[in-house]
Regions:
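Charged, amphipathic alpha-helical linker segments immediately N-terminal to NTP-binding catalytic cores
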Residues: 1-25
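Walker A (P-loop) phosphate-binding loop of P-loop NTPases
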Residues: 52
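Conserved lysine of the Walker
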Residues: 55
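Hydrophobic positions on the alpha1 helix immediately C-terminal to the Walker A/P-loop
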Residues: 58
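Short beta-strand-centered segment that lines the nucleotide-binding/catalytic pocket of NTP-utilizing
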Residues: 72-84
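Conserved nucleotide-sensing/catalytic segment adjacent to the nucleotide-binding pocket
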Residues: 84-132
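Glycine-rich phosphate-binding loop used to anchor ATP phosphates in small-molecule kinases
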Residues: 114-168
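Conserved small/polar residues in nucleotide/adenosyl-binding loops
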Residues: 169-176
Length: 178
């Protein structure tokens, strides 16, 4: 089996397992394999998109593909694992008189200092690196952390990746109590 045929089959089989849907080999060749080839020598990748748009699916496909064909270790960080605790978000909501911060998701509800620390340590290869794991059922971090000891490609995925929160001054000046 040629390398291109192996990559086509692997990608198609992986997408079926991840999504339950069959993607044509033409679409895989024209889109997925081009993207995967383009990423081969990258060290970092940010994937942003709305909820349910396929960020996690694409991240897992990249991880599996890179391990199989390039022997590279891909680490996937989800911005979701860096949410502030429920208590911290409620405190922000009271402080700024808006319930926007009570729910997860909007810019300003993540622990960006910890995210920067973790990503910097991963990029500097200061292993091991411990990554928080957020439990959406309890709306708080789990009691354990994921241990990472190697990274060749770091993927950060989330729906507001790179978005900046509205300034606190602006929020105070435009209090509406949403």
């Amino acid at each position: 089996m040629s390398e291109i045929t192996a990559k086509l089959k692997f990608t198609q089989d992986t997408l079926i397992r991840l999504t339950g849907k069959k993607v044509s080999q033409k679409e895989i060749k024209d889109h997925y394999l081009k993207l995967l080839s383009h990423l081969k020598h990258k060290k970092t990748l940010m994937i942003a998109g709305s909820q349910g748009s396929g960020k996690s699916t694409l991240s897992v496909l990249i991880k599996k593909f890179f391990l199989k064909f390039y022997s590279k270790n891909v680490v996937i960080l989800s911005i979701d694992d860096f949410y502030l605790s429920s208590f911290q978000r409620k405190r922000l909501a009271r402080k700024f008189n808006t319930d926007l911060f009570e729910t997860r998701g909007v810019p300003g509800t993540h622990n960006l200092k910890l995210l920067y620390k973790v990503t910097n340590n991963l990029m500097k290869k200061e292993f091991p690196v411990y990554v928080p794991v957020f439990d959406k059922v309890t709306d708080n971090k789990k009691n354990y952390k994921r241990k990472i000891s190697k990274v060749d490609l770091l993927i950060l995925e989330g729906w507001c990746v790179g978005s900046k929160p509205v300034s606190y001054t602006h929020l105070r000046a435009h209090e509406t109590g949403y």
